[in-house]
Amino acid sequence: MTLQRISKDYLKPNYGLILLIVSYFFNSSMVVSTKVLENDPLETSQSRINPLQILLVRMSITYCCTLVYMHWNKQSVPDIPWGPAPCRKWLILRGIMGFFGVFGMYFSLMYLSISDAVLITFMSPTLTIFLSFLLLGEPFSKLEALGSLISFSGVVLIIRPTFLFGEQTQGQQSPQDDIVETQNPKLRLIAIGVSLLGVCGLSSVYIIIRYIGNKAHAIMSVSYFSLVTTVVAALGVLLIPSMSLQLPHSWKQWGLFLNLGISGFIHQILLTMGIQRERAGRGSLMTYTQVIYAVFWDVVLFHHWPNIWTWCGMAVIVSSTIWVINMRASKQNVVATAELLSTSDFELDDLED
């Protein structure tokens, strides 16, 4: 099989999916930086950076990157810096929904274990499929619905929530275990509710970006999201009494913050480009690759090897993802994808200009 045939049969028809897969790699890089900033064993507990403040720094750097990019490519980016007038209300809504998506995850982590919090966010692809069908009129086959369920089952094998697999005893517990997951039913209920609100926000972002399509440059979506999140996070840090502004105090922390901003910028650019080129339901399934990236970083950085359940879950996710990619869309959808690829004004090459 020649490279030309591979490009014609696999790369071009799945160009949007490839962009999404790469974008989630940069998202995983942000997660690693956040984890080190919050849980660095070399730092004292007083030196830990608040998650909302991490979000503030990350999004402010990302917004600065969007401004530099727009002015650097002013010939190909129209209506700088606010985008086309008819799309501005949708871009603002995209920023608001994007903030709810991020806030839901960060808030739930205060009271839920990481596994439970992540598991809830993976309800987003299924919700997106139904929203895209209801609001955008996009078709989705029974096989795609089955593929989403299979992928979700793989996530369950990796996350292994306690309400399905039971309590897993790992020696004597310390008094600080309540920090990992609260035992207060009311706090858990609030955390789950806010997390579900975040899921709705994530799914809404897919729908809004897909609705905007190519009517606005992809950088505008990133710009509005980062600006809205920066403003809201700054207000939270300034107005919430229990929070105070804490600057990084080492070159390592500054480097991690810089990686947060740059990776966030690249992630949002590729994510928007991928969503614009792929149906919302099929594209949202690529979020499951984040689980694979998480395992990769665990092994490389923290020397934590997956157990048998994790390997089984990875196999299920990879298999179902490949299955979805190779599913033949209807003749109508293939023509639409070809037209979208041929008329798009925003390509990866633009990032190199």
UniProtKB/Swiss-Prot annotation:
Stored InterPro entries: EamA_dom (IPR000620)
Protein keywords: Membrane, Repeat, Transmembrane, Transmembrane helix
Membrane side Cytoplasmic: residue ranges: 1-16, 70-94, 138-144, 210-218, 276-282, 326-353
Domain of life: Eukaryota
Pfam families named in the record: EamA
Disulfide bonds: none
Matching PANTHER family: ACYL-MALONYL CONDENSING ENZYME-RELATED, SOLUTE CARRIER FAMILY 35 MEMBER G1
Residue intervals on the Extracellular side: 38-51, 116, 166-188, 240-254, 304
Transmembrane regions: 17-37, 52-69, 95-115, 117-137, 145-165, 189-209, 219-239, 255-275, 283-303, 305-325
GO cellular component, one term: endoplasmic reticulum
Organism: Saccharomyces cerevisiae (strain ATCC 204508 / S288c) (Baker's yeast)
Subcellular location per the Swiss-Prot or TrEMBL entry: Membrane
Membrane topology of this protein: Multi-pass membrane protein
Name of the protein in its database record: Probable transport protein YPL264C
Segments forming domain EamA: 24-160, 200-326
Main subcellular location of this protein, as a coarse class: membrane
